[in-house]
Regions:
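Signal peptide processing junction and immediate N-terminal pro/mature segment
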Residues: 21-22
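Short aromatic-glycine motifs in intrinsically disordered, low-complexity regions
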Residues: 167-174
Length: 249
């Protein structure tokens, strides 16, 4: 079911909320199969994407519950593609596993609002890449919010595309979070596209645990942001960047 959102109305924006609950998957879980879309009240299952496959899951409306686990094997990719008008929050409340690519694509239909993906604090064995992107170049942008140590072995990529506007891709830290690596350099121009912020008014810790060089050069702790369904907000909390590995920024 497609939900058309009048984004100018706060009530309508607040109604745009998608929850995705992910159980614990393994490489032995049944194959995901073909590209698909969200269905209402989907039962909990576990799936895997292996063998250098590329699979898309389209989100065509808000207010869905999708309970599944996902293993993404090395060389494979899984894309969650938001097809609404934007300004929605998609919660991924569970553990990923594998070494592949998880791409999160936000749709933005209004310049004053961002779309947000929230990855929970559940333990995870995922050591792949999480790539944040958006359709078009609207300044509302896309947000990835993380917390906890579940993604301590994963790398977040905020590099965007060649036509991505600067600072349109945001990594938000809720209290404290760990990552193996962080990248925001556009491979075509070398321009840094990302920004890292606290998700609220409190100062947040971002710990980088990897051993490679971090190619992040965007802003850290900037106070102005687009905050999904709430529109423009200005949190005062900054970021404590903790280099726990042997990597350098």
């Amino acid at each position: 079911m497609r939900l058309h959102l009048p984004i100018t109305l706060l009530a309508a924006v607040l109604a745009c909320y998608t929850s995705v609950s992910l159980a614990v998957p393994t490489s032995e879980s049944p194959a995901w199969g073909a590209n698909s879309t969200f269905n209402n009240n989907e039962p909990a299952n576990e799936y895997s994407v292996t063998g250098s496959q590329s699979v898309n899951l389209d989100v065509n409306s808000g207010n869905n519950n999708y309970s599944t686990g996902l293993y993404i094997g090395a060389g494979s990719s899984f894309t969650i593609n938001q097809n609404t008008n934007g300004a929605c929050t998609i919660n991924l409340n569970g553990a990923f596993a594998g070494e592949g690519n998880l791409t999160l694509v936000a749709a933005n239909g209004n310049a004053g609002y961002a779309s947000k993906f929230v990855l929970g604090s559940q333990e995870s064995s995922f050591s792949g890449n999480i790539i944040l992107s958006q359709k078009g170049t609207q300044p509302g942008g896309a947000i990835l919010q993380i917390t906890g140590t579940a993604l301590a072995n994963a790398t977040v990529d905020l590099s965007g595309s060649i036509n991505q506007s600067s600072s349109a891709l945001t990594l938000q830290i809720s209290n404290a979070a760990s990552l193996a690596g962080l990248n925001d350099a556009d491979g075509f121009s070398g321009t840094h596209k990302g920004r890292v912020q606290s998700a609220n008014s409190s100062r947040a810790n971002l710990t980088l645990t990897g051993n490679g060089n971090y190619t992040y050069g965007g802003s850290i702790g900037a106070t102005t942001q687009h905050s999904g369904v709430n529109g423009n907000t200005t949190p005062t909390g900054g970021i404590n960047l903790i280099m726990a590995g042997t990597g350098t920024q």
